[in-house]
Structures are given as C-alpha cells and as structure tokens.
C-alpha cells in the first residue's frame, strides 16, 4: 500500500473531541488520549486529557493517503495503557475514499460512534474528527510543539496497539449516544447546578438516563435552542447530571421535561399549570395520619364507611352519620335512676352519676357509637360497636371524659398526660386485629403529640404572604420570628384575601404552596433523585446560591413548623434523607435512590473477587462547578489500594461520602432549623418510613388505578395468586397501602396523574409483579424498578400473612 501513497502529506486530520466515553472504574475518570494510524505505517498520538469522559483535543496531523487508505483512530486510558487491555475506550475505522474526494479536494466533519475491539469490551460514546485536503494553513500542533508522529513503520507493537485496518464493525446495538452530536460544541457552557425538572408543572416522563455516566452529546446550539429550532421567549434548555434534557421557563420560574411547542401560548401554559396544581392540591388535602383517621376530619374514611356499612336495623341516616363521626344523639325522656343534670358557671350542662360518684359531659340518655378497628364478617378492617355510655361503668382512676367543640367525645389520661379517642373501658381498639407496626405508629404518634414541647403556646403568630411571592415572603416572615413565636397559634393571611379562617384552610394551603415552591429545582437547593422525578434529595451544588445555608435553615424550620402544627408538605425525599434526620447510619441499600449505577457497581464489588480486575484506592473524584478534584475517603486514601480484605470498608466510606458528606453543610443547616421546633429526641421515636408519613401524610390510594397500570412477569392477571393479591390490597386501609407502596417503590408518593406516570431509575417504569421465589419465602422488592417478586403462594391466607410480614417488619426502603 505504501508504494501507492504520495510522497508528501495530502490530508490533514484534526482529532477534535470525544463525547460520552465509557467509565470503567466506579469512581475514577479516565485520562483519554487518541492514536491515529494509517495502514500501520503512520502513527500520531494526541496529548492526554486528565480525568474526563469528554476529552477535547483539537489537534491536527498531516498524513499521506489514497482513497483506499484506512484511517484508524483508537482511544485509550493513559492510566491503564500498560495493562492487558491497554485501557481501550473505543475505535473508529474510516476509508478515506468513502468520505472525501482527494482529487476534487474538500473539508468534511465526521461524528462516528466508537466501536468495540476484538476483545469485545463495552464501549460508549462518539469521536468527532475533521478531514481536509487544505494543507496551506500552518499545522498548529507543529507550531506549538505538540505534533508527535512516527512516519516510519512501527517496530514496537508494545508501544502502539495494533489496529485491524478493516471496514468499520457493525454497532453492537442501538447507539447509546445522543443523535444530535453531529455538530459538537467544543466549549460547551454548562449550568453549574445539577438540577432536574419539576414534575409539578407539566407532568411528563423524563427520558431514561444514559448508562454508566454517559453524558448527552454536546452540540453547537445555544441553550436557547435545540435541534427543533429556537425555544419560545423566556425558555432555556438545560441538562441534568444524568444527561437528561429539561427545559426552564424563566417566565414562571418552573421546569419541565417537555419541550415547549413553537406555538407556545403563555395563557394555555398557565391553564395547564393551574389544572395540574389543582390535582396535586386535591391529593394533598386527602392525606392524613392514623390518629386523624378516627376523627370527623377524615372525609375519605367517612366515605369508605358509608359504602362498606349499612345502618343498624331501624336506624336512620343520622345513625350512619353518628357512626362515621363518633357523635351522639340528643337525649330524651327522664334521666336514669341515680343521675342528675347540673350546669357549670359558664352555663355548660354536665351529668352526675350518684351510683358511681362520677361526672360526665355526656347525656346518659344519648346513644354513643364507638369506632373499633378489627376484621368483621365481610373482611373489612373497620367495625362499629354500639355501647350506651351508661352501661360502661366508671372511667379508670386518673381518666377524664371531655368533648371537643364539635361535641365529639375524647378521653384524657392524667396519669400519662395523653389524650385518645379510645374509651379505656372498652377492649383496646389498638390491639384487636391490628398489625404490630400500626399499633406502634399510632402509639408513637399519640405520645409524640402529647409531649410538652409539641404543645401550642398561648398567643398568635401572624404570617402574611403573597401567593405569587410565597417563597421570598415566607422566608422573611418565618426567619424574623423566634422559635417560641412560631409555636403559637399560626395565623396565615394571603395578601388581598380578607376573611376569617382561624388558620385552618389557610394553613393547609400555605404549606401546600410553599412546599411546591421551596423544593422547586429551579432554585438549585434540591434536585430530583436518580430513582424518579418526584422524590427529592439535597443538591450538592446548591452553593451556586451564596445564601444557600440560610435557605436550608429556613426549609428546616418549615418542615418542623408543618409537623408542629399538624400539617403536611407536598414533598417526598429519598429514604436516606429520613435516615439522616433520625441520625441513623446510611447503608448501601440507600444508594439505590441516589445513584443506581453506583449502587450496582458497589454491590458487584462486594460480591466478586476484585484482585487484578479493578484498581481502586480509598479516594474518589468529584466535580464541582467544572473543577475536578480528588477526595480522600480516609487519611492518605489515594495511596491505599482497595483489596478483597478492605473492600467492605471502602463501600461503607463511599456510601457515606456520596449520601452524607457531600451535603453535610446543607443538611446540618436544615437540621438546625428543624430542631428549633421539633426536638431530636422526640422525632427519634419514629423510624424512617414513619417519618415520611409524618411529614407527607398518608395518601388515598386508588387500587383500581394501581391495578390497571400493573405489568406481570410469569403471572397473568387471571391467576389466583394475582386475584388474591388485589383482593388483599383492597381490604387494607390507607396506611397499609402506603406501607406496601413504600416497600415496592421506595416512597409513598403517587405521581399526580396516577400510577401510569410511575417512574423507575431508568425512566417510566410501571408497577410489576414477578413470579419469583419459593412459596416458603417472603416477597421481595426492587425499588429502583417498582417490582415485587411474589412467590406462588397456595392460599389467600398464606399470601396475606407473608405479604404483611414483608411490608410490616422490613426496615429501610430498598430490599434489593
């Protein structure tokens, strides 16, 4: 071939950049360099670019070629060049005559997918080069002393890898790189935050994340346009830290996965946002806790009971209403023997039972209906027991019966300084057919809310905000007041909305709107997790806002304020965040919601022999605002190799760094605000799953929607096991359903549009039930994939027993 080559160089090859290279090491980025060869006779090498998956060289090489010449360009990791595989990262083979006419001349920009070599190592990414017959301009490499060429045939096969000068190999599968990479930007401007779009604007499914840290291809388009043209006024295109494209609407300070249409209409967009917000508001207002579920403030429970129960014989509609609310009927006729009616100085009637020498607010002629938890004949979880107060006898020592302002009976235990809806003279409704975890949660809740530190102080705390400026106004109002003032009765007033509310509906609306605003990724304080696009985690790059620590303290105060005043926030965090709030140690399982790829790599490291396969040290590479630095996981860590003996310690330290250490400043600021209202020793009575419910409440889950958007593997919907599964779920109350949702998906959060929008770690992922496991084993869950591994249990009773144990007794969020 050499005899057919011209005597002088006739083609200039510019190796511009590579994009989205494969990251073979868990925490170490490669040091890429490129080697260009023609027929094994001419070899040129670029400089080494340190610690990157997207190296930029822009180096020129002049070659002697003909139309049949094969140009081969390989990329290697300089750190591993002396290893067996030489740190191979990919190759392209280009036949010169296929891309440029040497006789006519020309200039061609090429973007080619990197291919595998003969050893079949995994390869990702693209290589961008330029071929030109114009050699009249000076070679900038030669001018800068960077041109390292070997014009004679290589005699050292160990120095430069041998390349098969054949036609390009077929791609091993669909290209993993961004198809828009044909016009790469050589100096892309990256937004320093790694935020992700909020699903609260236009609920949409984000595309799957590129695998193994691959970033989307950079183009020479500005951030205000994309391949479809220029974005509407006020819109910007960004990319999150998983390479997913999202769009920022600066007009409304919101984000979305969905590209705005070219005929974007602000009025239409506003209407869509309002409709979406109304759906979320309705879902938020339906959330409750177990203690609330026994009260008249639980509309969903009342509705369910009205459907599940019929009035007693001879009963009326008012009797059904009484059963749903726990109220009493008006007494008529004479008082029973030994009873007397008296009046307090304030004019309130009460009744004296001289038979037992006790007093009560309740007219003994009234009939009280007591709500009892347990299984009835129909298999429902709630039954109503009718019991005349006069037949119950006296209250135990130290107990008192009182009425709420809606005439509902409750009981005060002065021995423990607690209150309860449950009549102590009846068999405990907490212990009849109620799962252990539920007894524990309800008792914890009663204990928690009865503590002196959680009692509302005398006086009022006035907060006035504007709806369209709620974040800034709330920050100013809440941060100017002392913690003791915030513990007074909270009176929320929206500017321009006069009316007497006593803080009830306004408080609920206030926390709903504020939680939507302050957790919006637009502000770079929080970002959506790797698991989905609706659970939150602290943004490690929140320092882009110089006041971020003050804002985290404010957010901590708001979360504490919501718990203190028994309101819910419309936001849900990764499981590890709740663990951190309880000062619990995070584990490898918690990594699933933060970085699914890293979780998989670390799990593989623990389960396999790594000697001679993976070269790691006790150090990690971290990039912050474009600067990459090496962080020691322990003193001198970068010089300590990871071995089979110490890999367990390595995994623990990596997990601690990735989840806790990177956001330690922000989290400590958050907790300083939170603990001003909620003492740490009190909140620690809950576990992490209960804390999620305490902050966000328990959702009213639509089982029909859940079932409709479920896939099956190994099962069919008509199988008896599946029929029994849904039958059991329908009989469970809202809390048990939320626990099941936590067990299988990692959160009790349901997307605004229902289960059809359920997300996994790799994009949209429907709830899935897979036939897996021995009938003697418990069900298992894969929270990253919203999957439940359900063994083929023989009977309904066995299925319910096994499922209940798995859901109730399992700690943590991820099971695998």
UniProtKB/Swiss-Prot annotation:
Residues 482-816 form the HECT domain. It is found in: Cytoplasm. Its EC number is 2.3.2.26. GO terms for molecular function: ubiquitin protein ligase activity. Residues 279-294 have a biased composition (Basic and acidic residues). It comes from the Eukaryota. E3 ubiquitin-protein ligase which accepts ubiquitin from an E2 ubiquitin-conjugating enzyme in the form of a thioester and then directly transfers the ubiquitin to targeted substrates. Probably involved in the regulatory network controlling carbon source utilization. Residues 151-168, 177-202, 217-226, 253-270, 295-309 have a biased composition (Polar residues). Keywords: Cytoplasm, Repeat, Transferase, Ubl conjugation pathway. This is Probable E3 ubiquitin-protein ligase hulA. It is an enzyme of class 2 (transferase). Its main location: cytoplasm. GO terms for biological process: intracellular transport; protein ubiquitination; ubiquitin-dependent protein catabolic process. Residues 310-333 have a biased composition (Low complexity). Residues 229-262, 333-366, 393-426 form the WW domain.
């Amino acid at each position: 071939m050499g005899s057919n080559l011209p005597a002088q160089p006739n083609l200039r090859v510019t190796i511009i950049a590579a994009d989205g290279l494969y990251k073979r090491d868990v925490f170490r980025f490669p040091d890429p360099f490129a080697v260009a060869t023609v027929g094994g006779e001419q070899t040129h090498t670029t400089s080494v670019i340190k610690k990157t998956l997207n190296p930029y060289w822009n180096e020129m090489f002049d070659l002697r070629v003909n139309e049949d010449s094969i140009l081969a360009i390989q990329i290697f990791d300089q750190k591993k060049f002396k290893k067996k595989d030489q740190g191979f990262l990919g190759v392209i083979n280009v036949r010169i005559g296929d891309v440029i006419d040497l006789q006519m001349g020309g200039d061609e920009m090429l973007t080619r997918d990197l291919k595998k070599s003969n050893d079949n190592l995994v390869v990702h990414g693209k290589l961008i080069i330029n071929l030109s017959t114009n050699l009249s301009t000076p070679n900038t490499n030669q001018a800068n002393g960077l041109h390292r060429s070997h014009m004679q045939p290589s005699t050292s096969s160990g120095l430069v890898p041998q390349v098969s000068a054949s036609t390009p190999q077929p791609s091993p599968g669909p290209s993993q790189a961004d198809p828009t990479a044909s016009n790469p930007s050589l100096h892309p401007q990256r937004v320093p935050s790694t935020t992700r779009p909020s699903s609260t604007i236009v609920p949409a499914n984000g595309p799957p994340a590129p695998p193994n840290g691959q970033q989307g291809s950079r183009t020479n388009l500005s951030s205000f346009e994309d391949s479809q043209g220029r974005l509407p006024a006020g819109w910007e295109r960004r990319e999150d830290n998983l390479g997913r494209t999202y769009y920022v609407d600066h007009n409304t300070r919101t984000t979305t996965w969905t590209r705005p249409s070219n005929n974007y209409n602000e009025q239409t967009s506003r209407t869509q946002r309002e409709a979406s917000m109304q759906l979320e508001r309705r879902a938020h207002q339906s959330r409750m806790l177990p203690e609330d579920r026994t009260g008249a403030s639980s509309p969903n429970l009342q509705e369910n009971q009205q459907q599940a129960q019929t009035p007693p014989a001879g009963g009326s509609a008012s009797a059904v209403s009484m059963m749903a609310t726990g109220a009493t009927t008006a007494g008529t006729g004479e008082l029973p023997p030994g009873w007397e009616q008296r009046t307090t100085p304030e004019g309130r009637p009460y009744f004296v039972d001289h038979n037992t020498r006790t007093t009560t607010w309740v007219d003994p002629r009234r009939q009280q209906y007591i709500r009892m938890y347990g299984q009835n004949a129909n298999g429902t979880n709630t039954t109503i027991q009718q019991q005349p107060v006069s037949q119950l006898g006296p209250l135990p020592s130290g107990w008192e019966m009182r009425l709420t302002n809606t005439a509902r009976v409750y009981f005060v235990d002065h021995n423990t300084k607690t209150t309860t809806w449950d009549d102590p003279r009846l068999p405990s409704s907490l212990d009849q057919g109620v799962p252990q975890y539920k007894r524990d949660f309800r008792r914890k809740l009663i204990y928690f809310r009865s503590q002196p530190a959680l009692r509302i102080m005398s006086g009022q705390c006035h907060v006035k905000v504007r709806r369209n400026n709620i974040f800034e106004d709330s920050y100013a109002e809440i941060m100017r007041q002392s913690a003791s003032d915030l513990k007074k009765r909270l009176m929320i007033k929206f500017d321009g909305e006069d009316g007497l509310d006593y803080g009830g509906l306004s408080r609920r609306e206030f926390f709903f709107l504020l939680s939507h605003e302050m957790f919006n990724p637009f502000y770079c304080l929080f970002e959506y997790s790797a698991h989905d696009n609706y659970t939150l985690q602290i943004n490690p790059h929140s320092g882009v806002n110089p006041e971020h620590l003050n804002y985290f303290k404010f957010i901590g105060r708001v979360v504490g304020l919501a718990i203190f005043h028994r309101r819910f926030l419309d936001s849900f965090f990764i499981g590890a965040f709740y663990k951190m709030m309880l000062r619990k140690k995070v584990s490898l399982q918690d990594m699933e919601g933060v970085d699914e790829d890293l979780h998989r790599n670390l799990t593989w490291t623990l389960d396999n022999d790594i000697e001679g396969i993976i070269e790691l040290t006790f150090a990690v590479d971290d990039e912050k605002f474009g600067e990459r630095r090496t962080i020691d996981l322990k003193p001198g860590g970068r010089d300590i190799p990871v071995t089979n003996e110490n890999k367990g310690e390595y995994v623990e330290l990596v997990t601690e760094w990735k989840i806790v250490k990177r956001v330690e400043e922000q989290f400590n600021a958050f907790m300083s605000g939170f603990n001003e209202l909620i003492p740490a020793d009190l909140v620690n009575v809950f576990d992490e799953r209960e804390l999620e419910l305490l902050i966000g409440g328990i959702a009213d889950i639509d089982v029909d929607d859940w079932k409709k958007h479920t896939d099956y593997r190994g099962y069919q919907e008509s199988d008896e096991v599946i029929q029994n599964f849904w039958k059991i779920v329908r009989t469970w109350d809202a809390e048990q359903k939320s626990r099941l949702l936590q067990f299988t998906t990692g959160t009790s959060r349901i997307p605004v549009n229902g289960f059809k929008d359920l997300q996994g770690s790799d994009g949209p992922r429907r709830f899935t039930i897979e036939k897996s496991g021995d009938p003697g084993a418990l069900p298992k869950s894969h929270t990253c994939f919203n999957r439940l591994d359900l063994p083929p249990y023989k009977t309904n009773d066995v299925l319910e027993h096994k499922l209940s144990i798995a859901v109730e007794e399992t700690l943590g969020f991820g099971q695998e």
